């Protein structure tokens, strides 16, 4: 909310995760967040999960109450500098500002702070991982140290180094990460807190296994064998769509195949149990990102009741990916500069107490991005037989692109798709004024209204390209004899560009009513209605093709909840019911409305220093509305001929990819991939002798793996745990994930690729962590 109120008095569903939970349960990315909070689910997101799903929609990350740039799976947030985090449902408050993407909720990182009492040093080393059937090396070391330099100045430094591989063949997981923080007590009235961070990593997109079927979901039975373009049926020879020579005569048809409209040859097809560590990753595939960010907070106390707070956040990053099978991404600039000035005033009018926050907020965000997923022939590859030889068959014929025919100037090997909002240069200037007042009407009843107005100026255009080919009116790729340079915002005779700008005024309203039955409880009702930017699915930014609607996307939250702390603050319980109305984005296609309604329960119990228990439960009914949801392939059976039986059904022989859209009956369907029921529990015991154990289940209910509901992932239970032993200056911990060695899966980009791909999580795996404390 932008103030210092406690979690019980916050009129929102909030879950707090402390440093001990993060360390003990080895929180590494957004896929680990759901165990701590109801309403949170994190799918694999192509192996680089940057943000979780909250209440049926994507979410965003804040740092100390300031909005970070959105990144679905390109630049994942670093946790090296994070001391704890809060998971908040719904839009950001009047003070924080609503999210620019992912209106479901947000994760607010609380950064590591310097120590003023004495010098503290911790060295932590993790060795692993021992996994069933396929162990892999991924050691990491963290050095975290800090202390006072004087009675007014203190510092903290944390360095993380991780080398080695991920679980899947050809997967990498490498990071170098430095975090530095200082706190300076300038005077009794002025305090300055600052931190800066730089990290770079090399990982891989893990798109999972292809040729998905229900039998593969159930038991790993995979249909192998070579695939080629279908030569019968309504899509016969559509896969031969690359013309050999430039400037062909009219009505020339292609002679080369690009991997689309393919079906597995029934004469050579076979079935095999696919190892879970086989995925569509080539030996030369890579995903790299770099991020530099700095935050400075200055607090000046004018009087005991009035203070001025200024928060500054600067963020700059870039990333790139190259997957020889299907995808190219080049993001040379992700930039954000935000400065928020706040006036905090506590005052009384008669018997009514107020805690007022008002101020001004300015935020600039800039993005330059290219991506090419014009043709992603997932079903063309036999993952079992050709795990080290994935290469897009049309790459050389299509001018070293993945079907887009647009090269990136100065970005050797990278390419772009025409007409994609993922290729953009955008600059957004957001100037806002806000006010929020926590009004204590009676000792038990308080009202918190808020209002925010954002004046947004946005400029968006296509970036510069070098065009080497295009798709003609017959959907045939035609190479150009002479490449054409297209300047930023420009066009060619074959590819229209765009250069748009707009200015809008977004108004957001917030209202909460809070009633305290006693000092340790609260019953609240919240209504929030916000206008905010809805950017692109992958990188945020804006949708330059539909700029005005992109800048004024509405989201509404209705929430009623009850919270209480019992038994001398050893037991915390919260419950809420909610309805959220918002918009989601597609990789290809228009934004679509989402309505999510549900019930959330959360409990934390620490009766003494030995026992800690927590659990949560979610029931949600998330519905997506729309008449068109783009699909790479319309039916998973399209990859098989009618003479091939899969899941007891004959193939359609249509071939995939086949670039279609799905129109759900009645214009509505369950939100793609979102489970209706989730539950998590965990218990930890610490012996006075220094040893301890923790374990608990994570349950995810049935999930539809494609829009049609013809593929589903049954309910899954994953048990994780650890054992440890420690003394005052050291401790040792062994973590085990998926203790019961269950087959666990996640949907991937359900609307877009649900009929093509599915993600298989690792089986049982273990790691060893040793920590030294000084």
Question: Language model features by range: what are they?
Answer:
Residues 570-571, 576-583, 590-708, 740, ...:
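Gram-negative outer-membrane beta-barrel transporters
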């Amino acid at each position: 909310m932008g103030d210092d109120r406690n979690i019980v008095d916050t009129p929102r569903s909030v879950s707090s995760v402390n440093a001990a939970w993060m360390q003990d349960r080895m929180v590494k990315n957004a896929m680990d967040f759901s165990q701590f909070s109801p309403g949170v689910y994190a799918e694999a997101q192509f192996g680089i999960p940057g943000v979780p799903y909250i209440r049926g929609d994507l979410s965003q990350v804040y740092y100390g109450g300031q909005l970070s740039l959105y990144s679905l799976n390109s630049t994942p947030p670093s946790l090296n500098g994070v001391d704890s985090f809060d998971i908040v449902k719904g839009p950001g408050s009047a003070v924080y500002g609503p999210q620019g993407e992912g209106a479901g909720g947000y994760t607010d990182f609380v950064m590591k702070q310097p120590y003023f009492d004495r010098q503290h040093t911790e060295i932590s080393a993790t060795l692993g991982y021992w996994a069933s059937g396929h162990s892999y090396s991924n050691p990491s070391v963290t050095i975290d140290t800090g202390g006072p330099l004087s009675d007014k100045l203190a510092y903290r430094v944390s360095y993380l180094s991780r080398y080695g591989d991920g679980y899947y063949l050809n997967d990498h997981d490498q990071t170098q990460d430095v975090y530095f923080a200082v706190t300076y007590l300038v005077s009794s009235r002025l305090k300055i807190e600052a931190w800066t961070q730089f990290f770079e990593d090399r990982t891989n997109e893990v798109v999972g296994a292809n040729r998905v079927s229900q039998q593969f979901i159930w038991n790993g039975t995979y249909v192998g064998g070579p695939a080629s373009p279908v030569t019968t049926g309504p899509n016969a020879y559509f896969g031969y769509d690359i013309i050999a020579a430039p400037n062909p005569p009219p009505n020339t048809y292609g002679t080369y195949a690009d991997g689309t409209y393919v079906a597995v040859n029934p004469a050579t097809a076979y079935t095999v149990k696919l190892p879970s560590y086989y995925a569509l990753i080539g030996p030369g595939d890579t995903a790299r990102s770099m991020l530099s960010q700095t935050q400075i907070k200055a607090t000046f106390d004018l009087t005991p009741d009035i203070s001025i707070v200024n928060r500054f956040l600067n963020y700059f990053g870039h990333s790139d990916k190259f997957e020889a099978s299907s995808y190219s991404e080049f993001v040379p600039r992700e930039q954000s500069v935000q400065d928020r000035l706040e006036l905090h005033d506590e005052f009384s009018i008669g018997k009514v107490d107020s805690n007022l926050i008002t101020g001004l907020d300015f935020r600039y965000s800039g993005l330059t991005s290219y991506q090419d997923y014009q043709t992603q022939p997932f079903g063309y590859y036999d993952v079992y037989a050709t795990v080290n030889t994935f290469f897009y068959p049309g790459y050389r014929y299509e001018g070293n692109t993945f079907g887009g025919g647009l090269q990136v100037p100065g970005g050797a090997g990278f390419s772009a798709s025409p007409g994609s909002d993922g290729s953009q240069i955008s600059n957004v200037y957001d100037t806002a004024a806000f006010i929020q007042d926590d009004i204590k009407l009676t000792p038990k009843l308080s009202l918190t209204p808020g209002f925010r107005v954002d004046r947004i100026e946005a400029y968006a255009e296509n970036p510069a390209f070098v065009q080497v080919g295009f798709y003609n009116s017959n959907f045939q790729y035609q190479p150009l004899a002479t490449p054409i340079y297209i300047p930023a915002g420009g066009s060619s005779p074959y590819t229209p560009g765009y250069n748009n700008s707009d200015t809008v005024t977004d108004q957001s309203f917030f209202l909460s009513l809070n009633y305290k039955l006693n000092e340790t409880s609260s019953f609240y009702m919240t209504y929030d209605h916000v206008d905010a930017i809805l950017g692109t699915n992958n990188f945020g930014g804006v949708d330059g093709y539909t700029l005005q609607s992109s800048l004024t996307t509405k989201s509404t939250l209705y929430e009623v909840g009850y919270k209480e702390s019992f038994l001398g603050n050893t037991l915390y319980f919260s419950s809420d019911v909610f309805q959220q109305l918002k918009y989601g984005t597609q990789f290809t296609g228009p934004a679509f409305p989402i309505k999510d309604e549900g019930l959330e329960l959360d409990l934390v119990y620490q009766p003494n220093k030995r026992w800690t228990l927590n659990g949560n439960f979610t029931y949600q009914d998330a519905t997506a509305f729309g008449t068109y949801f783009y699909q790479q392939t319309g039916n998973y059976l399209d990859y098989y001929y009618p003479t091939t039986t899969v899941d007891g059904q004959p193939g359609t022989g249509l071939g995939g990819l086949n670039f279609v859209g799905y129109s759900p009956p009645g214009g509505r369907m369950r939100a793609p991939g979102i489970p209706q029921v989730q539950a998590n529990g965990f218990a930890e015991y610490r012996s006075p002798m220094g040893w301890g154990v923790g374990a608990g289940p994570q349950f995810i209910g049935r999930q539809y793996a494609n829009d049609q509901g013809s593929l589903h992932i049954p309910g899954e239970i994953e048990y994780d745990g650890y054992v440890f032993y420690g003394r005052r200056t050291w401790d040792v911990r062994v973590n085990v994930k998926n203790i019961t060695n269950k087959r666990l899966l996640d949907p991937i980009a359900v609307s877009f690729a649900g009929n093509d791909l599915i993600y298989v999580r690792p089986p049982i795996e273990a790691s060893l962590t040793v920590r030294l404390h000084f």
